[in-house]
Design a protein with these regions (language model features):
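Short acidic/polar N-terminal linker immediately downstream of export determinants
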Residues: 2-112, 121, 134-164, 197-198, ...
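Glycine- and small hydrophobic-enriched segments that form the cores of compact globular domains
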Residues: 119, 125-129, 151, 161, ...
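Active-site alpha-helical segments that house and flank conserved acidic catalytic motifs
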Residues: 80-83, 169, 261, 282
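Surface-exposed, acidic/Ser/Thr-rich flexible loop segments
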Residues: 92-94, 181, 271-273
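Right-handed parallel beta-helix
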Residues: 168-207
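Short loop/turn positions at the edges of beta-strands in beta-sheet-rich folds
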Residues: 74, 161-163, 182-184, 274-276
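Surface-exposed or flexible loop/turn and strand-edge residues in extracellular/cell-surface modules
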Residues: 51, 77-79, 86, 152-154, ...
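Short, surface-exposed interaction patches in beta-rich subdomains
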Residues: 61, 101-106, 112-121, 128-146, ...
Length: 324
């Protein structure tokens, strides 16, 4: 009787497990079919090549809105805003001109590339480029099950040299390779979220950048050759991710710059070149205890060496200031 009871219990348990598996498989099939129908409702899900030119040339003087300061509006830098989500993105300098060039490949039924232009009452102009998904993330996930589709969206944006701009860049959920070297930049504001992002200044900018602002969360951000931007000010914040900042580059001789890095829940590494003078203040907070330390850095003996006033704070993570 005991063996028969155990056998019956085993059969019942086995049948229950098979039922659960069948429900999961059936639910997955239904979810996949519904997701694919949802995706098709947005349009063509097949990737297509795209090439677009976006004019950055200033509007005619008579097009300035009433009350605008005509001369100021013609000479003020154009504000370029790039908002890029869910893809692999490359941003690079191009030949002199007055157009942004956008090239890439994506499914028009799943993603959308838009542009807009505006002028505020002061005459300041803005060009905005936005790339984002149209279909819900859950639908794209389930629709991709079983079809081996790994052809995600890719975009390359080329910024013309010689056009003065203030740049706002927001990149999220993806990968980015960004090179802003050789451009004419005023203020630069970069926000990177959820992904692997690399920003470089491979060659010196035309004129010193007034302010560099970086924000990184839930991902990794690598900053290379920051000295080639010759920034007067850097403000960088990071949380739930890692940040590496290389300060090498062609800093302006005799210049003074204020650099601030604030990091929480992640690692921060700041690499300092040997051809600058550095006043460093590094503060760390761990478990309710705060420490203040001054890293041992070699100071340049060149009387024209640039001076970097570096302030670093970290909490629930590790911050290092090192010298190559």
């Amino acid at each position: 009787m005991a063996r028969s009871g155990w056998k019956t219990a085993g059969l019942i348990a086995g049948a229950g497990c098979l039922s659960i598996i069948a429900i999961i498989i059936g639910g997955g099939i239904i979810a996949t079919m519904y997701a694919r129908a949802t995706v098709r409702s947005f349009g063509d899900p097949n990737p297509q090549s795209v090439e677009r030119r976006i004019a950055l040339s200033p509007p005619p003087a008579e097009a300035n809105p009433p009350g605008a300061k005509g001369e100021a509006s013609r000479t003020a830098p154009l504000h370029v805003r790039l908002e890029l989500q869910e893809g692999t993105f490359t941003i690079q300098p191009g030949q002199p001109g007055t157009e942004l060039q956008v090239q890439g490949r994506f499914a028009p039924g799943l993603f959308e590339l838009t542009e807009s232009h505006s002028t505020d009452p002061t005459g300041a102009r803005e060009a905005r480029v936005r790339f984002h998904s149209k279909a819900p993330a859950w639908a794209r996930f389930f629709a991709g099950i079983g079809n081996g589709d790994e052809d995600g969206p890719e975009l390359t944006i080329t910024i013309p040299r010689g056009t003065p701009i203030d740049l706002t860049l927001e990149v999220s959920v993806g990968r980015s390779q960004i090179d802003l070297g050789g451009l004419t930049l005023g203020d630069v504001n970069v926000t990177a979220t959820m992904g692997e992002h690399r920003l470089d200044f491979r060659e010196p900018v035309v004129k010193n950048v007034r302010e560099l602002r970086f924000s990184n969360s839930m991902g990794n951000l690598s900053l290379e050759h920051i000295g080639n931007a010759r920034p007067e000010t850097i403000n960088a914040t990071g949380s739930m991710g890692n940040v590496t900042a290389d300060l090498a580059g062609a800093w302006s001789p005799g210049s003074e710059s204020n650099l601030r890095f604030d990091q929480s829940m992640g690692d921060l590494t700041v690499r300092v070149p040997s051809n600058v003078r550095v006043n460093a203040d590094v503060r760390s907070s761990q478990g309710g205890e705060s420490t203040n330390r001054t890293p041992a850095l070699k100071q340049s003996d060149d009387p024209k060496a640039p001076t970097l006033r570096l302030h670093v704070t970290s909490s629930m993570g590790n911050a290092r200031v090192i010298q190559d």
